[in-house]
Amino acid sequence: MNFTKSLLVLSIGVAMVGCGSDSDDIIVPDMTLRIAHVNDTHSNFDPVKSSFTMGADGKKVYNEFGGYPRLLKAADDIKAGAKADKEPLLFLHGGDAWQGTAYFKLNEGAANADLLSQMGLDAMVLGNHEFDLDTDKLASFINTVSFPVLANNMDASKDQYLSNVDNLYPYQLFAFEGSEKRAITSVSDASDDEKVVAVIGVVLGDMPTIATGTGDVTFSDQITATQATINDLKTKGVNKIIVLSHIGNAADKELAANTTGIDIIVGGHSHTLLGDFTDLDQGNNGIYAEMIPQKDKVQKTCVVQAGQYAEAIGDVDVSFDINGNLLSCVGNNTLLSNDEFYHDSHREHQMMSSDKDDVTSFIDNNDKITIKDEDIDLRTRIDATYKPALEAAYGDVVAAAPTEIGHERRPGDAGTDKHGSDVAPMIAQGMIYWANQQSVATVTGKNVQIGLVGAGGVRTDIA
């Protein structure tokens, strides 16, 4: 695909007329920046079994999306493209790297720290699931990773463990000269030839209400704290502001609309694959790179997010004028597929010859999905270091579903009906069955008739 070339040309074209401007005057950008981003990867080191449809003909294809080695290869390809174009780049993680698979249960964040450190990330914001254990485990994770961890509306000074970490910051400054990049601690560290960009971390202000391991950490209002941080950065001479958030797409828009000075919000938490993926039967969850008017109604903030489970990567080009105002913000999410395709959910009937060629041709002509190889070194590291314990923990397969039982967190996603997940009701029914067993009912003295389960706690299809 020629996505990289078309993305750059379109971005420059928009920058020349100005973003949200009524003027036809040519505005020469002071700086362009490319951002690759992921979020809510949830320990999906291996690919996720999935499916998509081939446009109007509705032919269903069973495949795999993502996994850390495929995600790394995609990120490296984006970095190589930016370097070839002499374009500065940041690679950002929107939080919730923890939980999701048995890899996390077996390693409690240690494997996540190891593998994320191989990714070449520039920064990560804390998600709510990073607080699922205790702050001791989180402190170990933060001290181990090779990139800064961010949260500006959080005070860890009274926590026994997090108060001592030296890799947790409210924001991180980056100095760019052409495509060359370095992290700096103060604006004064930048030379006259370098452009300074701030990445501010924003976490949930109500974190203790949904996370169990917050310790003695306190959290403050997302909007108030972030505006104060922006104002402080502005007084120091920083006028190019990126927010790396884990508060959800709706809250990202609210943050953009109630502050001034944010150029782009790179989000997470709501698992929102922004963009129109209806031709792939993956739903339409809103505009990628949507422009939200800021509180002053003069400038706009661009909002992006890249789905879930390391299945996709976001790639966006932004440009700024000399005052740090956003001129353009153009890009999209791309689903990362393997190159083995099947006719059935059990992966027993592989597509060969012309069938596979048809799928490959469809993908090559669709900028929302791509076939991507895995990074060999990272795959080897996972298979040698972490997979043996995972396979031993899972044991033998004891049953199989004759047909795929679908799961989506939100009704209407990926072709589901108004009721959404088919897996979640089965789990709720299983809870009723368990509660009404004689051994349990004898203790509770209850006859349970209703089972409730949050669909967000269900993570995958059954196939």
What is each stretch, according to the model?
Residues 15-18:
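C-terminal motif of bacterial Sec signal peptides marking the signal peptidase cleavage site
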